[in-house]
């Protein structure tokens, strides 16, 4: 694949409670054909909206709230899965090449917005109740304010799934098991630092590149959530999931081109804002509800779930301490970390995910 926009184009014309396909032509200055709907073009790195249910929910809500008068045209596979694809989405929105975009919060610490790195602090946000508490705090709005330096306007931070270590030959438990391995991940300063701190080498590889690198043995594991692990057909290539190690959650950040937002009417902007707020509010319950069924599917496909011992967990945290030291060098990021740590102290983690009988590693 070559860098740049992929040809896959999906138009989501969402009206009332249904979605339909449409195309736009001959737009006026508000972005719509005379008398027709406003069409907003959205860059997205995956192959389709189903890869990020909270983002798909935002798109659906825009259609419902606007009665179909605002449509979001999703341009999938933006960046063709190259390591810098998510950064390309941000830049495309900033320059007005597209109107809207979304990217994982992980990428922004590589683009001069370090505050989002607190969301990727390893093994900090390790439960869905805590992730939900973070979203319901002041943190998202404070983090989104930093996006102005990238010439985009933040709309919302959406919760997404917890990501685990997944490996080819054996479960990744204590740091000694990580030593010398190459681990697939996404472009992220914090996440790449964490993998190095555990003794492994980070390799930015996702989409078809992850599959290719697994087949060639270039990577021996990766960080991913169980839902995508099943959906992307990766179980046969890497069977071992460490169930009780949540490295970090994925957060999906929605943003818009400021000039394009200004060209909309006040009502159209309000629909976008309401859709973003609603999607953020329900994002964690949406993805958390898929976790149990995904574990069962993975088990049926041959995955095996391992449990790190208390000693393993302590060793992991000790190795990862250097990542926190680096995060705390930025005053704002340090403040964000302290707020998340306080939320963690006051938020019960909820029950551990149930692992089906016969699905534990070694069985």
Question: In which residue ranges do the predicted regions lie?
Answer:
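Non-membrane alpha-helical secondary structure
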Residues: 1, 6-7, 312, 332
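Secretory targeting and sorting signals
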Residues: 2-24
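N-terminal secretory/targeting leader peptides
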Residues: 21-125, 153-363
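Short, solvent-exposed loop/beta-turn-alpha elements that line the ligand-binding surface or hinge
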Residues: 126-149
């Amino acid at each position: 694949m070559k860098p740049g926009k992929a040809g896959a184009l999906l138009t989501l014309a969402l009206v009332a409670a249904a979605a339909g396909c449409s195309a736009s032509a001959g737009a006026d200055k508000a972005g719509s054909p005379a008398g027709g709907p406003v069409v907003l073009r959205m860059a997205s790195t995956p192959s389709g909206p189903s890869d990020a249910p909270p983002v798909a929910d935002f798109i659906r809500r825009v259609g419902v709230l606007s009665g179909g008068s605002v449509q979001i045209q999703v341009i999938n596979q933006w960046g063709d899965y190259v390591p810098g694809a998510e950064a390309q989405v941000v830049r495309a929105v900033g320059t007005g090449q597209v109107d809207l975009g979304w990217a994982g919060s992980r990428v922004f610490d590589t683009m001069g917005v370090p505050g989002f790195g607190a969301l990727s602090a390893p093994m900090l946000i390790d439960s869905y109740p805590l992730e939900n508490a973070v979203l319901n705090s002041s943190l998202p709005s404070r983090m989104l304010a930093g996006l102005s330096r990238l010439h985009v306007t933040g709309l919302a931070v959406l919760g997404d799934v917890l990501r685990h270590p997944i490996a080819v030959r054996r479960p990744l438990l204590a740091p000694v098991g990580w030593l010398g391995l190459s681990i697939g991940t996404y472009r992220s300063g914090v996440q790449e630092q964490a993998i190095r701190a555990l003794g492994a080498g980070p390799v930015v590889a996702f989409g078809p590149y992850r599959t290719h690198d697994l087949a060639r043995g270039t990577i021996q594991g990766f960080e991913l959530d169980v839902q995508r692990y099943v959906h992307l057909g990766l179980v046969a290539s890497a069977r071992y999931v460490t169930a009780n190690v949540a490295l970090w959650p994925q957060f999906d950040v929605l943003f818009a081109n400021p000039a394009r937002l200004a060209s909309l009417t006040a009502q159209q902007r309000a629909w976008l804002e309401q859709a973003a707020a609603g999607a953020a509010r329900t994002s964690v319950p949406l993805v958390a509800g898929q976790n149990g069924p995904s574990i069962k599917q993975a088990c049926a496909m041959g995955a095996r779930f391992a449990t790190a011992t208390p000693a393993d967990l302590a060793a992991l945290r000790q190795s990862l301490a250097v990542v926190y030291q680096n995060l705390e060098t930025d005053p704002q990021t340090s403040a964000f970390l302290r707020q998340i740590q306080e939320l963690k102290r006051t938020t019960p983690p909820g029950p551990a995910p149930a692992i089906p009988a016969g699905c534990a590693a070694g069985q």
